[in-house]
């Protein structure tokens, strides 16, 4: 008996069949439709699908019709979908004010009627959350540090490190190795202290002008797009702030940038992705 293995085309067809949904609606966000004269949105979404609003008593879901969920191993395709998803949420923000953003690839079956029931089932929660986020936005703050200037001058300010380096220069090979190790340990200790100090200073500076703040994970060192200097991510914050406080927030970040070797990357305003509750699943 011949073992029939599916061709790539057959495998793709099978995968698509497994991901088919019945009268699906892809959700981008939930909005307060009372904040706009018209509960409509003129834009296209993922895969150029027309986007529209399904409304239930002043609360609307921004959706498009879909027949499959959006899953692929093609990372570039996923990135394109994510960018489009964000663009639709941005358009909804412009039209209706701060939305409650949904996760990428959130799909409900059952057509517009199921969306209306979903909105009605979670109506009180949606109304409360939309009211609480009205006029506030999420901002992302990333503190980067080039430690080279610090390493070049810290011995002038730290007696212990200066002593170790002086003894190292005056010692023989065996002793010199141990002193070099101690010197490096002291330098690393001082750098850890400086990282903590910078993060604390940033948090202290921005806290008075934000409504909420959460620390996010940092990755390994970033390469600056305009420089060969490798900068370390010290801390990343997501903050929730009133739109009127954006300038004040930026001014406070400027005081942190004055420190040598420090760079702040400040982005926003974003919908409250980090702070919006996972309601209405």
UniProtKB/Swiss-Prot annotation:
Induction: Probably part of a gvpF1-gvpG1-gvpH1-gvpI1-gvpJ1-gvpK1-gvpL1-gvpM1 operon, maximally expressed in early to mid log phase. Gas vesicles appear earlier when grown in static culture, possibly due to O(2)-limitation.
Result of knocking out the encoding gene: A single deletion produces no gas vesicles.
Localization in the cell: Gas vesicle; Cytoplasm
Pfam entry (one): GvpL_GvpF
GO cellular component: cytoplasm; gas vesicle
Any one of the GO BP annotations: gas vesicle organization
Main location per the UniProt record: other
Keyword terms of this UniProt record: Cytoplasm, Gas vesicle, Plasmid
Keyword set includes Cytoplasm: yes
Miscellaneous comment: Encoded in a 14-gene plasmid locus called p-vac which produces predominantly short, spindle-shaped gas vesicles during all stages of growth.
Family: Belongs to the gas vesicle GvpF/GvpL family.
Chain's role: Proteins GvpF to GvpM might be involved in nucleating gas vesicle formation. A minor component of the gas vesicle. This the only minor gas vesicle protein that binds all the others (including GvpC1, GvpN1 and GvpO1, but not GvpA1), suggesting it might be able to assemble them. Gas vesicles are hollow, gas filled proteinaceous nanostructures found in several microbial planktonic microorganisms. They allow positioning of halobacteria at the optimal depth for growth in the poorly aerated, shallow brine pools of their habitat. Expression of a 9.5 kb p-vac DNA fragment containing 2 divergently transcribed regions (gvpD-gvpE-gvpF-gvpG-gvpH-gvpI-gvpJ-gvpK-gvpL-gvpM and gvpA-gvpC-gvpN-gvpO) allows H.volcanii to produce gas vesicles. A minimal gas vesicle can be made in H.volcanii by gvpA1-gvpO1 plus gvpF1-gvpG1-gvpJ1-gvpK1-gvpL1-gvpM1; lack of enough GvpJ1 prevents their formation. A similar region restores gas vesicle production in H.halobium without the p-vac locus, but it still has the c-vac locus.
Subunit description: May form oligomers. GvpF to GvpM interact with each other in vitro, and may form multi-subunit complex(es). Interacts with GvpC1, GvpN1 and GvpO1.
PANTHER family, per the entry: PROTEIN GVPL 2 (PTHR36852:SF1)
Protein name in UniProt: Gas vesicle protein L1
């Amino acid at each position: 008996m011949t073992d029939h293995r599916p061709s790539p085309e057959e495998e793709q067809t099978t995968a698509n069949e497994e991901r088919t949904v019945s009268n699906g609606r892809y959700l981008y966000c939930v909005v307060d439709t009372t904040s706009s004269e018209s509960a409509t949105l003129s834009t296209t979404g993922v895969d150029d699908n027309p986007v529209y609003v399904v409304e239930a008593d002043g609360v609307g879901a921004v959706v498009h019709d879909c027949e499959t969920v959006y899953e692929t191993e093609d990372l570039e395709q996923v990135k394109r979908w994510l960018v489009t998803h964000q663009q639709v949420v941005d358009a909804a923000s412009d039209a209706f004010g701060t939305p409650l953003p949904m996760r990428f690839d959130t799909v409900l079956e059952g057509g517009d009627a199921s969306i209306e029931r979903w909105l009605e089932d979670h109506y009180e929660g949606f109304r409360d959350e939309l009211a609480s986020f009205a006029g506030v936005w999420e901002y992302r703050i990333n503190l980067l540090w080039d430690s080279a200037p610090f390493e070049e001058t810290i011995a002038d300010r730290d007696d212990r490190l200066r002593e170790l380096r002086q003894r190292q220069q005056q010692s023989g090979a065996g002793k010199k190795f141990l002193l070099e190790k101690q010197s490096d340990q002291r330098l690393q200790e001082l750098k850890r202290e400086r990282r903590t100090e910078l993060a604390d200073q940033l948090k202290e500076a921005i806290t008075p002008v934000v409504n909420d703040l959460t620390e996010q994970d940092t990755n390994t060192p970033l390469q600056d797009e305009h420089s060969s200097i490798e900068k370390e991510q010290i801390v990343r914050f997501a903050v929730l702030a009133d739109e009127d406080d954006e300038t004040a927030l930026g001014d406070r970040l400027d005081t942190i940038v004055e420190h040598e070797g420090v760079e702040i990357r400040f982005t926003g305003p974003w919908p409250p992705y980090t702070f919006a509750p996972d309601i209405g699943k």
